[in-house]
Design a protein with these regions (language model features):
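Active-site-adjacent helix/loop segment of glycosyltransferases
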Residues: 128-206
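A solvent-exposed beta-alpha-beta segment
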Residues: 212-309
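Conserved donor NDP-sugar-binding/catalytic core segment of glycosyltransferases
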Residues: 12-48
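Short, flexible, basic/aromatic active-site loop/helix in glycosyltransferases
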Residues: 53-92
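The conserved acidic donor/metal-binding loop of glycosyltransferases
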Residues: 8-12, 278-280
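Short aromatic/hydrophobic "clamp" motif used to bind/position activated sugar donors
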Residues: 4
Length: 318
């Protein structure tokens, strides 16, 4: 094939996504890889959708939080490039491996994913090699949903070791042009950061009272579905002992164009998730509606009548 798509299993793509990305690559022969606008389950934009080159200085400003304090300053915003409009096309140094459309010619020139990495860092490494091969990495503002991080808990020793191990591998591979003493200092900093993160994980596991979940409650769903599938969703809630007062709205994409956004903000109180029936709402419409209410922090649930499964970020209900 002419193109190769790297795609995480914890993603949801609108019906026209792949076609739109391929059309862009067909009209931009300099595009070696394309990434897209990734949304979290509550609709907010995931900044790792477009990233800068992770130099030691760039990584330091990220770790110290300076990129949040000065988001529009190029000096401090080199990691997430938040000064670049998330709703516009940009040529960027690094794309996320959760969704990466690759031109096979570029992949043949740059080489495949480096097996020295495991789970983290290989997308950054590949992005850099595609650029070195003479192609560009493009960020496209076409939204997809990324549940993100369900495969590995960030509160685990394994995550910390693998994540910072990948950082060390990347620097050893791409940082050979730095002076020896500087390289030693950077690697020592990575080891120190690993130790600090492992210590935090240890404390969280052994002193749970300090990090107990506050305000954690049973899911309460705001459900938009066809009348036919409403009974199936009710049955799923009952069989999983979801006893909160859920709200059901018989609707479809045409009759309820505004979806859950038709409610006044004060009426969102108490709901934790908005659930859409995928047989009457397209994925494109669902993501559009979710992004319009991201400040409400409602998590997205999707009911698939073909599999009779209700998918949420936390778990799947059958």
């Amino acid at each position: 094939g002419e193109y190769v798509l790297l795609l995480n299993p914890d993603t949801l793509l609108p019906e026209t996504n792949i076609t739109e990305v391929l059309e862009f690559m067909d009209t931009h022969p300099d595009a070696g890889a394309c990434g897209v606008k990734m949304l979290a389950p509550d609709g907010h934009f995931l900044p790792e959708s477009k990233r800068g080159y992770p130099s030691p200085a760039t990584s330091f400003w990220k770790l110290t939080g300076m990129h949040r304090i000065f988001p529009d300053n190029p000096r401090f915003d080199g990691y997430y490039l938040s000064r670049l409009d998330e709703n516009a096309v940009h040529s960027v140094p690094v794309l996320a491996g959760a969704y990466m459309m690759l031109r096979r010619k570029a992949l043949n020139s740059s080489g495949l994913l480096d097996e020295d990495f495991f789970m983290y860092g290989e997308d950054i490494d590949l992005s850099c090699r595609i650029t070195e091969a003479g192609y560009k990495n493009y960020y496209l503002p076409y939204p997809i949903l990324h549940y993100k991080g369900e495969s590995t808990s960030k509160e685990s020793y394994r995550y910390v070791r693998v994540f910072y191990g990948a950082m060390d591998i990347f620097f050893c591979k791409h940082g050979t042009h730095y002076p020896l003493l500087y390289r030693w200092m950077v690697r020592a900093g990575i080891k120190l950061q690993t130790w600090l993160k492992l210590s935090i994980v240890f404390i969280k596991k052994h002193v749970p009272a300090l990090y107990a979940d506050r305000g954690k409650c049973e899911p309460r769903f705001l459900i938009f579905s066809s009348e036919k599938n409403m009974y199936s969703i009710r049955a799923i809630c009952q069989s999983n002992q979801l006893n909160e007062s859920h709200h059901y709205v018989i609707s479809n994409e045409r009759s309820t164009v505004a979806g859950h956004n038709l409610l006044q903000k004060e009426n969102f109180g108490g709901f934790t998730h908005v659930v859409y029936d995928s047989s009457v709402f397209s994925y494109s419409a669902i993501l559009s509606l979710l992004s319009q209410s991201q400040e409400e922090k409602l998590l997205l649930g999707i009911y698939n009548p073909k599999s009779h499964v209700l998918v949420t970020p936390e778990r799947n209900y059958v």
